[in-house]
């Protein structure tokens, strides 16, 4: 209690010193009466206690409010009875913290103004009229110069101007500055006494205003790697038996918010990138990768159908959302492939190494995915030998018609093309590889997906 009373005495003395240094006596009387109340008060009540007219008290309070020395707030008073009306009162009070900031700012502006005046006295030469004693600066010389005589003449009385020595004015300025700061020394010392203290409120009822503004929140964003249960943001409310009331007037309420990682998204990206380097199918969409081939999809669809049948026999619920979700996704993918790969779907599966349009089952060399074998794409280098064609066609039922792509002088299956092989390809070889890749995807993935959907 002694420390709190001490800081109140320091702040009250500071306000009294500032008012007595820069304002008339009647202002000091109003401030002293306001300091004695230590609460928000109406101007008519303050006028009754000081025995001064209300309009005079309000005028002084408005002047002090313009200088940020006092503050006011509108408080709504509810009606007590059914026949009464609610009213709004204007209450006046002092904000200690705001006054400290205002006094520091005004002292800084005083010092800055005195320094600017001192610099102006040194840098700017002045001239004084001997007749009317008007003072001019060096900036006024062009309009004061007489072109006939070449002398400086006063623009008011045409008197002669003489150069004024700035030593006396500098001495007066320095003396005035020292006198000012000697008078303000007590205020500066009183300001230093407030440093290191917690500035209290002027009145207890002001605590309601700070509570209405809400407490300040501090969020502790500690990341968590686990997927365990999240701790409650309000530790006091975890148990009903140990729940307590949160004080809304508390200045700091700390919330512990655990931010989980992004569920291993970076790990999944790294795995897909590694598989693409091995298979060379980086340009395919994710749902057309070999890992999502029709064989795996058939196994997954069979397992899902078995699980759905078991759940339907055990319960009378509707089909699970997993089957519907897969069906919707596959329809979307089918429409996507139809629109983007319609050119390769409509093209005949023909073309050989010699440019003759033969069937894919013939003994000649076959190029999978060419748009017509009538000499339109004879410049393509993606060709097959007779022996390789026979071996590839013999394995067409098991391997899904694996296509050989030319990389320089070598022929490599399309599913084993790597990024290094793509870099070694020429422009024409890479174009042929792209056409063959999309043709391979549309034939081996789309057809089997469509058949599996039709069977379901």
UniProtKB/Swiss-Prot annotation:
Keywords: Metal-binding, Nucleus, Transcription, Transcription regulation, Zinc, Zinc-finger. It is found in: Nucleus. Residues 11-100 form the HTH TFE/IIEalpha-type domain. A zinc finger (C4-type) spans 129-157. GO terms for cellular component: transcription factor TFIIE complex. GO terms for biological process: transcription initiation at RNA polymerase II promoter. GO terms for molecular function: zinc ion binding. Residues 377-386 have a biased composition (Basic and acidic residues). Recruits TFIIH to the initiation complex and stimulates the RNA polymerase II C-terminal domain kinase and DNA-dependent ATPase activities of TFIIH. Both TFIIH and TFIIE are required for promoter clearance by RNA polymerase. TFIIE is a tetramer of two alpha and two beta subunits. This is General transcription factor IIE subunit 1. The lineage of its organism: Eukaryota, Amoebozoa, Evosea, Eumycetozoa, Dictyostelia. The gene is gtf2e1-1.
């Amino acid at each position: 209690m002694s420390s709190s009373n001490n800081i109140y005495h320091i702040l009250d003395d500071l306000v009294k010193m500032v008012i007595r240094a820069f304002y008339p006596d009647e202002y000091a009387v109003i401030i002293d009466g306001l300091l004695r109340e230590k609460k928000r008060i109406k101007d008519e009540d303050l006028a009754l206690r000081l025995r001064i007219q209300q309009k005079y008290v309000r005028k002084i309070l408005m002047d002090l409010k313009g200088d940020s020395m006092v503050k006011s707030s509108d408080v709504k008073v509810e009606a007590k009875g059914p026949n009464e009306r609610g009213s709004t009162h204007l209450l006046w009070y002092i904000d200690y913290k705001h006054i400290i900031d205002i006094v520091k700012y005004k002292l800084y502006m005083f010092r800055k103004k005195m320094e600017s005046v001192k610099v102006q006295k040194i840098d700017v030469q002045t001239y004084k009229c001997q007749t009317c004693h008007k003072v001019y600066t060096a900036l006024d010389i062009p309009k004061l110069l007489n072109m006939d005589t070449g002398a400086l003449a006063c623009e008011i009385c045409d008197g002669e101007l003489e150069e004024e020595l700035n030593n006396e004015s500098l001495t007066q300025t320095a003396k005035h500055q020292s006198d000012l700061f000697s008078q303000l020394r007590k205020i500066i010392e009183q300001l230093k006494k407030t440093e290191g203290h917690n500035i209290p409120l002027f009145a207890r009822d002001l605590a309601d205003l700070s509570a209405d503004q809400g407490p300040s929140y501090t969020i502790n964003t500690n990341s968590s790697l686990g997927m365990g249960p999240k701790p409650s943001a309000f530790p006091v409310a975890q148990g009903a038996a140990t729940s307590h009331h949160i004080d809304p007037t508390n200045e700091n309420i700390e919330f512990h918010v655990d931010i989980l990682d992004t569920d291993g998204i970076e790990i999944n990206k790294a795995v897909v990138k590694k598989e693409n380097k091995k298979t060379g199918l980086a340009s395919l969409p994710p749902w057309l990768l070999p890992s999502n081939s029709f064989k795996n999809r058939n196994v997954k669809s069979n397992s899902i159908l078995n699980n759905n049948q078991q759940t339907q026999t055990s319960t009378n619920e509707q089909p699970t959302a997993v089957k519907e979700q897969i069906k919707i996704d596959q329809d979307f993918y089918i429409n996507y492939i139809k629109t983007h790969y319609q050119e390769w779907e409509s093209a005949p599966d023909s073309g050989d190494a010699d440019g003759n349009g033969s069937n894919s089952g013939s003994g000649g060399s076959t190029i999978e995915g060419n748009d017509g074998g009538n000499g339109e794409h004879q410049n393509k280098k993606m060709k097959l030998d007779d022996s390789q064609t026979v071996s590839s066609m013999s394995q067409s039922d098991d391997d899904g018609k694996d296509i050989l792509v030319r990389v320089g002088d070598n022929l490599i299956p399309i599913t084993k093309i790597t990024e290094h092989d793509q870099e070694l390809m020429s422009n024409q070889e890479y174009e042929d590889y792209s056409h063959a890749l999309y043709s391979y995807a549309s034939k081996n993935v789309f057809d089997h997906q469509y058949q599996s959907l039709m069977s379901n």
